[in-house]
Amino acid sequence: MAAGGLKPVFAVYSSFLQRAYDQILHDVCIQHLHVVFAIDRAGLVGSDGETHQGIFDLSFLTSIPNMTVMAPKNGSELSAMLEFALLNFNSPIAIRYPRGQAYDGLEEYNAPIRYGKAEMIIEESDIALVAAGNMLITAQAVREKLKEKGYNITIVNERFIKPVDTDMLDLSLIHISEPTRHAQI
């Protein structure tokens, strides 16, 4: 279908996607075909049992040439990523999301999707938390706990898992902590 000019969207559980590794590599990515992989149940899925955990897709998808991998922070970003993948992109792309109803938090942060670029959620000075997908929920909770202790926390939505936004590595320059015997500088 993709070789014929269509834009197929393949919706699949993460645990079943691994069975198609060879086809993804040879029939889609090496040929640089525009296929969108909508990967449901990505990550740990406790109630689905040990054989249906979506824990391997990151390792094998990021090793495939020409594959882009994204993870939305919430339902709105999932919709924006699908639109980006279908209308503004022309290569293999995977969008991975967890099981269950889409998270509706962080709605106030909706920077336009630019290829390979992370989204700055909150920029402060002490500690930087960089997370992708539903791990932003955890990052937000950690930020609240650390804020109570007086820390200023940056949160970055690393919406592209591959390619990684290397500009975000510059965050380490302003968030470096040099331990000393009695304090941190």
Q: How should these model regions be labeled?
A:
Residues 1-128, 137, 153:
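Conserved thiamine diphosphate
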Residues 34, 163, 177-179:
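Short, proline-centered helix/strand-breaking motifs
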Residues 99, 160, 181:
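Short, glycine/acidic-enriched loop or turn micro-motifs at the edges of active sites
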Residues 131-132:
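Internal active-site segments that recognize and position negatively charged phosphoryl groups
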Residues 140-173:
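Generic long, charged, amphipathic alpha-helical segments
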Residues 174-185:
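Single conserved hydrophobic/aromatic residue that forms the stacking wall/gate
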